[in-house]
Amino acid sequence: MRRVYLDHNATSPLRPEARAAMLGAMDALGNPSSVHSEGRAAKAIVEKARGQISEAFGVGAHDIVFTASATEASALALKDRGFHAGDIEHDAVAAWVEPDLPLNAGQVCVTEPAQTALQLANSETGIVQTLPASLGFCDMTQGFGKLPLAFSWSGADIACASAHKLGGPKGVGCLMLKPGVEVAAQVLGGGQEMGRRAGTENVIGIAGFGAAAAASARDLSDGKWAIIEKIRNILEKTLEASGKHLILDG
């Protein structure tokens, strides 16, 4: 029997474009912080990926902070900042917020947008939240590459994303900042990522992230996810017509 992998919200298969970009980056010898030619070559790979993510996610290139995961990005944005949320958030966000916001028909009731953390889409139920006009933090990990979305018009001050949710490698994510919004670095000891996150960048992983982001944006514009939505609807209707007692969640 042929197995079909359906757990893409947990992690998605590596895209061929990401694999090719990562293989190419493996030959980059230098440290992207070094000023010699090898270092500049590695830096160019990082900045190419930053540009790809900037275009795919609708965020300024200088407002992207590369991290090791969306979990780290969430901590960088939320730790000790007194944010509130509903009780539906991923553990990476729930660890840093007060989960005291009520829900109404699956939607979080936002009362103080500037101090609210809100996920765009739930990894288990698939429920998509209606984002308010302004928002302190948005976990966009499950939305990028699947929903028509740009950080620039989302209304969020800060958002996070992860490479392996859209066909990139595990172990790399990013934080996105609205122009003028800053975060206090938690990893110190270097000036990488414009002083926001110290440590030598994961050049290979970032290369894969950029390529995956570009490919996912093409899939979205080509209508791939509209087709998947139709298939999902057919599946739901078929299950409902089976006569079995079903509860569709999401």
Could you tell me what each predicted segment is?
Residues 1-250:
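Pyridoxal 5′-phosphate
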